[in-house]
Each structure stands twice: as structure tokens, then as C-alpha cells.
A protein has these predicted regions:
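Short solvent-exposed coil/turn linkers within tandem alpha-helical repeat scaffolds
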Residues: 53, 93-102, 116, 131-139, ...
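N-terminal positive-inside, membrane-proximal cytosolic segments immediately preceding the first
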Residues: 1-36
């Protein structure tokens, strides 16, 4: 029988009890990998990839303080401003609409909402982010959107987004294989498939990860075998 799970302030969806176990396990840590990626590449890399040119200077200056609050996990201040000189990612995205800085502000804002447990707002804001042809930020942003979909009960959309994130990461990697990001995204997709009792589809993903991403940590450590065994031993 399905159980009712509260994924947000006003969002109640019916999901199988197996899904409930998944979200109880991952609700607080579902975005840790994605947020870590954003934090690691914040600053110079983000600036060079997304914000350049004189017309972006003012917007990028506004972003800098927000990045500091974000890195310090002061997500409410990063999102809404500090009541002093910093306006917040939401206002930056609005005030500088159409700029690369505003696009990046939408990504940060979506991640702030996610970390605050406001998943519906996270979905809406992350959907505003426009991907670029980069190897890290855009795949991570797509994965973040996938996790936001999952936490609002849109499991099919979540699986699709996570698979797309892996494809995006692979497309910019040597030999079309991103051993750092893609296995993480695909394993999340497979676990969601398991929560839908689609064990065969999940098993195929796990086996594909083991075969394709041989140099990844999850394969090198034999962690992937635990996922495979979990299904095959049922």
C-alpha cells in the first residue's frame, strides 16, 4: 500500500512504501555531491565559464557575496539577502535578467531552496537555469534538478534528469567517460528505479556503470557490486 509523504510545505504525494525508505535515507544528503561540486568550482572557474565582459562586472560583484554565504551554508541569507549591502540571489537573478550572472544566480538560488527543504521552489528555480557546454556545472545543475524532482515526488522526471546529467558529463569527457560525476548520477537514477520496483532497469544501470566506468571510485572499491548483489539476491 502507498504511504503519504510530505515533500514540502504544501506538497503531499502518494508513493510506494519503498520510495518512502529511499527519501528518509537521502532527504538530508541528496544534494551533498552536487553542492560540493558547486562549492569547489566557485569563484574563478565559475567566473570564467559564465560571467565575463564589462557588462557582467556589476552582476558578478553582486554574486561574490552570495557565494560566500552559500559556501558558509547560510542559505537563507544567500537566497534573500543580508539586509545590508547584499541583495540575494533571487534579486540578482531578477535585476540582471538575461545576463550570465543572473543565470548562475538561478542555479545558486535553486540549490539554496533545496538545502532549505523547499523543493517545489527548488524545481521552479533550477528549471530557469540555462545549461552551457561545460563539463562540470551544467551536468551538476541537471543532477540537482533531478534530485529536486525526486523530492517533489516526480520520480520519472527525476530519473530522466539524472540520466541526462550523466550524458552531459560524459559528452565533455575523454573517451566519453566521466568517472567522477556520471556514476554518481546514474546510481541515483537506478536507486529511484528500485523505489518503483523496476529492478531489471536498475540492474542494467548498475551493470553498465561497472562496465563503462572502470576507473571510477565506485567500481575500483567494488561498491558497485553491492548494488548489483542487492538486486540479484532478492
Amino acid at each position: 500500500m502507498a504511504n503519504k509523504i510530505d515533500f514540502g510545505a504544501n506538497s503531499h504525494v502518494e508513493t510506494p512504501s519503498k520510495s518512502e525508505a529511499f527519501f528518509i535515507k537521502f532527504k538530508k544528503q541528496i544534494l551533498i555531491a552536487v553542492v560540493a561540486i558547486i562549492v569547489i568550482v566557485a569563484g574563478a572557474v565559475l567566473y570564467n565559464a559564465y560571467v565575463s565582459g564589462p557588462r557582467e562586472d556589476k552582476a558578478s560583484t553582486a554574486l561574490a557575496k552570495g557565494q560566500q554565504y552559500f559556501n558558509q551554508e547560510q542559505f537563507d541569507k544567500a537566497l534573500n539577502g543580508d539586509g545590508a549591502s547584499y541583495a540575494g540571489f533571487i534579486k540578482i537573478a531578477s535585476d540582471y535578467s538575461g545576463t550570465d550572472a543572473a543565470n548562475l544566480a538561478n542555479l545558486y538560488a535553486g540549490l539554496c531552496y533545496a538545502n532549505l527543504g523547499k523543493w517545489n521552489e527548488a524545481v521552479t528555480t533550477l528549471e530557469k537555469f540555462s545549461s552551457k557546454s561545460d563539463a562540470i556545472i551544467s551536468p551538476a545543475a541537471m543532477a540537482a534538478l533531478g534530485n529536486a524532482y525526486a523530492n517533489t515526488g516526480n520520480i520519472d522526471k527525476a530519473i530522466s534528469a539524472l540520466k541526462k546529467a550523466a550524458d552531459m558529463a560524459d559528452s565533455k569527457a575523454a573517451d566519453d567517460t566521466n568517472n567522477s560525476l556520471s556514476p554518481t548520477f546514474l546510481i541515483q537514477a537506478a536507486e529511484l528505479l528500485e523505489s518503483q520496483n523496476k529492478s531489471d532497469e536498475a540492474l542494467k544501470i548498475y551493470e553498465d556503470v561497472k562496465k563503462k566506468y572502470v576507473n571510477s571510485q565506485v567500481v575500483q572499491s567494488s561498491e558497485i557490486d553491492k548494488y548489483i548483489e542487492r538486486i540479484t539476491e532478492k
